[in-house]
From Swiss-Prot:
PROSITE patterns: DS_RBD (PS50137), RNASE_3_1 (PS00517), RNASE_3_2 (PS50142). This is Ribonuclease 3. It comes from Psychrobacter arcticus (strain DSM 17307 / VKM B-2377 / 273-4). Residues 185-256 form the DRBM domain. Belongs to the ribonuclease III family. It is an enzyme of class 3 (hydrolase).
Length: 265
């Protein structure tokens, strides 16, 4: 993988807040934001304008945005994940491999990757999309992951580097996808985990709905009756998506609890 290094100096005296989604000047602010993302990606861009394009939503620029990179990244992602599954699971048939790949490249999986990469703070959005909760919109986060894959491939001109980056983002998701439980949605997995430990079922509460259809954002809270396990609040384009995201984070939180989980009195 391409080693992490410092980016070149930005243009002198850039406009204040020059990457507050209102301009695409390569400024010191952009350099700083990209440096943070670089550490998460595990890749340093040679062409900063390509990195910028990969983060630009069509609401900011209807012509110069990440949609073409997303198209390329989608194709690369399917190939990289498919190849990894082919070698990782030599005894699985075509149908099973297809379902496993679908699980790994679906929106919910890409949103998890986007959250791990902290992409929401890096996206370049139009004013309306920002106000409408676009930074947490599942479709935008998933698309941005794919666009970054396309951008890394074009920037590096190296499939091996691209593959290494993508697989590092997935971590142990590919190893765990062979587990039938990993193929179930997060809410089902959370419920089964709690039932297996004789805990109460999780409680989901719709906290608020932001914006107007078709660009509404639903905010949901997930609660479990376990000591030292704070509530999880997440948002999504639908209540179902928000609940799934909250359940996924709750599962991760439960797995990190020290000792034996205990029920609240």
């Amino acid at each position: 993988m391409k080693p992490t290094s410092q980016y070149p100096q930005a243009v002198p005296n850039p406009p204040k807040n020059s990457l507050s989604d209102d301009t695409l000047v390569i400024s010191s602010e952009f350099i700083q934001r990209l440096a943070v993302l670089t550490r998460k990606l595990g890749y340093v861009f040679n062409d900063l304008s390509l990195a910028k394009l990969a983060l630009t939503h069509r609401s900011f620029d209807s012509k110069k945005n990440y949609e073409r990179l997303e198209f390329l990244g989608d194709a690369l992602l399917g190939m990289i994940v498919g190849e990894a599954l082919y070698h990782r699971y030599p005894t699985q048939n075509e149908g099973r491999l297809t379902r496993m790949r679908a699980t790994l490249v679906r929106q919910e999986s890409l949103v998890i990757i986007a959250q791990n990469l902290e992409l929401s703070n890096q996206l370049i959005l139009g004013v309306g999309e920002r106000k409408g909760g676009g930074r947490n919109r599942a479709s935008i986060l998933a698309d941005a992951v794919e666009s970054l894959i396309g951008a890394i491939y074009l920037d590096s001109q190296d499939m091996n580097i691209t593959r290494e980056c993508v697989l590092s983002w997935y971590g142990d998701l590919i190893d765990n996808v062979n587990d039938q439980k990993a193929l179930k949605d997060a809410k089902s997995r959370l419920q089964e985990w709690l039932q297996s430990k004789q805990f109460d079922l999780p409680h989901y509460e719709l906290m608020e709905t932001r914006g107007n259809a078709p660009h509404q954002l639903f905010v949901v809270r997930c609660q479990v009756n376990i000591i030292n396990c704070p509530d999880i609040t997440e948002s999504g384009e639908s209540r179902r998506i928000a609940e799934q995201k909250a359940a996924e984070l709750m599962i991760n939180q439960l797995h990190k609890l020290p000792g034996v989980p205990k029920k609240r009195r």
